[in-house]
């Protein structure tokens, strides 16, 4: 039964009952007319003047020819030569139905569904052809043999949608008390040979994007794009001169205004810290003239020639020392070990540190070259010439012997070594512990500087203790250059570096606009008691600073890690004390030898005083026993501290569990 007539697509909808179920179907009119010729309506077709009149069954033939041409145009295929209909007077009308009978049946029996399927198939073929052309074009631009080819294509497509506005020398230099910037280095030869991918994008002068590869449960790979914002962002094409122009150069004038300036490079081993601070490397040889050390010295001597500073008669001195495993060594004095003490005025003094007077940039370059040749370094998986210590180069201005200003340029050790606190090698553990502690303390000191806090936890590490005067005072300025590696293999360390730098910069905003900000240095008495009970430490200045430092970084420092840091600090203090006492005993032993030699010479006399000899010898022996016993007890305590450090290193949890 026909239920409806669809004039739009020239079809009818029919329904029937089969086994008690109502079923329906859509049938086009052409199929109905071909199966039921008696239903074809009688229409008078006017003959065209250009074509001969149709044969007897004009309606049928016209429809057949029309439909056959329609099908041919859809398939874009010419009909067979034998089935062509020639519009000529010579064509025999009797052969027309025979030639088109097969096409008539096929064309009229195609439903709308079949036609739609054919259209979809045609579109699908066009789409596949376009995708194939696109793949061929991509294969010309990128290396399809790369194992991370899929990630590489996703990164390239994402970068294609960005609007690039990189930092240029024409951009203005903003005034910051704390300036944080990021520098990206290019891929090195090793990363290129390993076909590592560049996952760092710097689209503008203050934005850094990290394309972190991730994998879903079904093993589908995708990108997680993380964005960070800083004061300045330098891409891999920025030279040292450009980095210096926006970072350390604005700080040079600070030291002429009786201020303290600090510029330090922070990042993973091999990310370009020493290259930025010291200069270009050619193998193990370094061109010191292109580093921030030399560029800052050049501007210092240029400023000295200005009339308003020339009349001050300032003297320029320089020091260069390193901090390795909590110990300070003078790089300009054959790596002599130095002691860091605090005088009665609470001023930190580096005992024995040599200051060299410099008259020109060439003198500075010589000192840098001497210091770099002595600096502690080693070969790692990331870098063939890896720095394992914090190097501090200071340009000091003095007026008539008194301190006028100081510029501290610091090349920090690789931040990834801070994860080596659970290593089986004690020396590696000490390196990691000192780096970990000094970086946390350095961050908190900058936070205190940015918030104008009255207390700075500089005693928490040897690095911040030496740089105490750079974090105190209204005329103190700091610049941080976070260097990052672009390779996908370094993605985790790069994110850690950027998070550290981002946390430092967050603290420079107005605390009233920063939302919920907890006070970090002033705890009520009961809270101090709670902290002492929780961390189990006494009340010495160094331990208090270390305790508060760990409390402010509770998500990064577990109680076990704090215990380890405490054990390391105690062990280092005891080591210094034991070595100092041993040196004193050695000097005393020389005096004992002289006294004993005099006693023995006295016994060679004929009538020497036996009572005097015995009394003096007994006194010498008692003094020896007392001093050596005291030294032995300290050595035993020192060995116990070594055991405690080893036990504490085995119980470290990297992160403190969050409160539920």
Curated annotation (Swiss-Prot):
Assembly description = Interacts with AURKA and PLK1. Interacts with PSRC1. Interacts with MCRS1; the interaction enhances recruitment of KIF2A to the minus ends of spindle microtubules which promotes chromosome alignment.
Region called Globular, residue ranges: 1-171
* Residues annotated with N6-acetyllysine modification: 75
Q: Which InterPro entries match?
A: KIF2A-like_N, Kinesin-like_fam, Kinesin_motor_CS, Kinesin_motor_dom, Kinesin_motor_dom_sf, P-loop_NTPase
Return the protein name: Kinesin-like protein KIF2A
Q: Where is this region: Disordered?
A: 1-140
Which GO molecular function, any one, fits this protein according to its record?
ATP hydrolysis activity
Q: Which Pfam families match?
A: KIF2A-like_1st, Kinesin
- Could you tell me which residue ranges the Kinesin motor domain spans? 177-507
What are the coiled-coil residue ranges?
Answer: 614-653
- Where mainly located? cytoplasm
GO cellular component term of the entry, any: cytoplasm
| Gene designation per UniProt | KIF2A
Q: What's its job? A: Plus end-directed microtubule-dependent motor required for normal brain development. May regulate microtubule dynamics during axonal growth. Required for normal progression through mitosis. Required for normal congress of chromosomes at the metaphase plate. Required for normal spindle dynamics during mitosis. Promotes spindle turnover. Implicated in formation of bipolar mitotic spindles. Has microtubule depolymerization activity.
């Amino acid at each position: 039964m026909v239920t409806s007539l669809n004039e739009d697509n020239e079809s009818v909808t029919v329904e029937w009952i089969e086994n008690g179920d109502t079923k329906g179907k859509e049938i086009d009119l052409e199929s109905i007319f071909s199966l039921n010729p008696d239903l074809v309506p009688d229409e008078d077709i006017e003959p065209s003047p250009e074509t001969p009149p149709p044969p007897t069954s004009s309606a049928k033939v016209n429809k057949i020819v029309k439909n056959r041409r329609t099908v041919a145009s859809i398939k874009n295929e010419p009909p067979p030569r034998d089935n062509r209909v020639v519009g000529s007077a010579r064509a025999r009308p009797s052969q027309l139905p025979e030639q088109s009978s097969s096409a008539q049946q096929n064309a009229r029996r195609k439903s709308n569904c079949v036609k739609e399927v054919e259209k979809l198939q045609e579109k699908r073929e066009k789409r596949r052809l376009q995708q194939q052309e696109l793949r061929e074009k991509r294969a010309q631009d990128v290396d399809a043999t790369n194992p991370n080819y899929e990630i590489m294509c996703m990164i390239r497509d994402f970068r294609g949608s960005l609007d690039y506005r990189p930092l240029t020398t024409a951009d203005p230099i903003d005034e910051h008390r704390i300036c944080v910037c990021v520098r990206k280095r290019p891929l090195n030869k090793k990363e290129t040979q390993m076909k590592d991918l560049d996952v760092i994008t710097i689209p503008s002068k203050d934005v850094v994007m990290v394309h972190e590869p991730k994998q879903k449960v079904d093993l589908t790979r995708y990108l997680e794009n993380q964005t960070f914002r800083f004061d300045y962002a330098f891409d891999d094409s920025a030279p040292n001169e450009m980095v210096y122009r926006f970072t350390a150069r604005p700080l040079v004038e600070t030291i002429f205004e009786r201020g303290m300036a600090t510029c330090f490079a922070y990042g993973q081993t091999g990310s370009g810290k020493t290259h930025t601070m010291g200069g270009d490397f050619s193998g193990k040889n370094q061109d010191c003239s292109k580093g921030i050390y030399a560029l800052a010295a050049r501007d210092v001597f240029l400023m000295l020639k200005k009339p308003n500073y020339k009349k001050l008669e300032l003297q320029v001195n320089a020091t260069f020392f390193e901090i390795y495993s909590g110990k300070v060594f003078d790089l300009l004095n054959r790596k002599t070990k130095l002691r860091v003490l605090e005088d009665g005025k609470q001023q930190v003094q580096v005992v024995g540190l040599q200051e060299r007077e410099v008259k020109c940039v060439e003198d500075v370059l010589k000192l840098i070259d001497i210091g770099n040749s002595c600096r502690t370094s080693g070969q790692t998986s990331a870098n063939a010439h890896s720095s394992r210590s914090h190097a501090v180069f200071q340009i000091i201005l003095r007026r008539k012997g008194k301190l006028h200003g100081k510029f501290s340029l610091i090349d920090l050790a690789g931040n990834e070594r801070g994860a080596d606190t659970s290593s089986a090698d004690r020396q590696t553990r000490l390196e990691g512990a000192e780096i970990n502690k000094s970086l946390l303390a350095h961050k908190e000191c900058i936070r205190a500087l940015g918030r104008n806090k009255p207390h700075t936890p500089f005693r928490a590490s040897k690095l911040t203790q030496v740089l105490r005067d750079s974090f105190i005072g209204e005329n103190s300025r700091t610049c941080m250059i976070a260097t990052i590696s672009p390779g996908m293999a370094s993605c985790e360390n790069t994110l850690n570096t950027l998070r550290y730098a981002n946390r430092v910069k967050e603290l420079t905003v107005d605390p009233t606009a920063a939302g919920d900000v907890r006070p970090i240095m002033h705890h009520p008495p009961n809270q101090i008691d709670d902290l002492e009970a929780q961390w189990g430490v006494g009340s010495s200045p160094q331990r208090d600073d270390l305790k508060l430092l760990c409390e402010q970084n509770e998500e990064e420092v577990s109680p076990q890690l704090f215990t380890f840091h405490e054990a390391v600090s105690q062990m280092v203090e005891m080591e210094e004390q034991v070595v100092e006492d041993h040196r004193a005993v050695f000097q005393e032993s020389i005096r004992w030898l002289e006294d004993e030699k005099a006693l023995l010479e006295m016994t060679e006399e004929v009538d020497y005083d036996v009572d005097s000899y015995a009394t003096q010898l007994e006194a010498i022996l008692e003094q020896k026993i007392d001093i050596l016993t005291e030294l032995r007890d300290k050595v035993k305590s020192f060995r116990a501290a070594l055991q405690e450090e080893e036990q504490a290193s085995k119980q470290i949890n990297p992160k403190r569990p969050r409160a539920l």
